[in-house]
């Protein structure tokens, strides 16, 4: 994989991880122990590996069977997901956040990684390298979740919505780029 191929994946990994970062900011404002913060970040990272992997496998199958239609659908999926993230982050009300423990941690990690499934589906259609992509998505999401949790301990929610909006705009941009390559 060349450096030029790696840069878009890194940017996309940050776009996907912004959801975990934003939610972690709010969660970090609670009294969490360092061990809890580390565990939450690792769990989010693992889900950001599993979800795009499943999406990429499914995307490759669709690509082999449906070719150009799958290519177009993958781009539209990224654009739609990006707009949805922007829309929902602008309109969502501030909800009560609880510390995820046990099953609720898995539900939480699944919730913030569901968009990586869709992106994985699109990347699978385009034939992206699976191992590098999923490890990058997982690692960046874990780091962003930890960053959000630690910043949240010190700041009172300055970036939450804005982080999600930026992530959504980046996904829209990549979807448009796939539809209309420069």
Curated annotation (Swiss-Prot):
Keywords, in A-Z order:
Cell membrane, Ion transport, Manganese, Membrane, Transmembrane, Transmembrane helix, Transport
Q: Does the keyword Chaperone apply?
A: no
The terms describing its cellular component in GO are: plasma membrane
User: MF terms per GO, please?
Assistant: manganese ion transmembrane transporter activity
> Does the UniProt entry include the keyword Transmembrane?
yes
Q: Where are the transmembrane segments?
A: 6-26, 37-57, 71-91, 101-121, 131-151, 162-182
Matches recorded under InterPro entries: Mntp/YtaF, Put_MntP
Cited Pfam families:
Mntp
Subcellular location(s) of the protein? Cell membrane
Give the main localization category: membrane
Q: How does it sit in the membrane?
A: Multi-pass membrane protein
The family this protein is said to belong to: Belongs to the MntP (TC 9.B.29) family.
Q: What is the purpose of this protein? A: Probably functions as a manganese efflux pump.
Name used for this protein in its record = Putative manganese efflux pump MntP
Organism listed in the record: Bacillus thuringiensis subsp. konkukian (strain 97-27)
């Amino acid at each position: 994989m060349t450096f030029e191929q790696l840069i878009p994946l890194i940017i996309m990994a940050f776009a996907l991880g912004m959801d975990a970062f934003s939610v972690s900011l709010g969660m970090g404002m609670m009294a969490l122990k360092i061990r809890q913060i580390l565990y939450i970040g690792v769990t989010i990272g693992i889900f950001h590996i599993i979800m795009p992997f499943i999406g990429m496998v499914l995307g490759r199958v669709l690509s082999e069977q449906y070719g150009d239609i799958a290519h177009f659908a993958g781009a539209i999926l990224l654009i739609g997901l990006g707009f949805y993230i922007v829309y929902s982050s602008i309109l969502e009300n501030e909800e009560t956040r609880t510390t995820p423990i046990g099953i609720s941690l898995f539900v939480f990690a699944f919730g913030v990684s569901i968009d990586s499934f869709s992106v994985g589906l699109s990347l699978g259609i385009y034939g992206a390298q699976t191992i590098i992509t999923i490890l990058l998505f997982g690692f960046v999401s874990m780091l962003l979740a930890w960053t959000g949790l630690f910043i949240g301990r010190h700041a009172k929610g300055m970036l939450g919505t804005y982080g999600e909006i930026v992530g959504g705009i980046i996904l829209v941009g990549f979807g448009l780029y796939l539809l209309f390559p420069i």
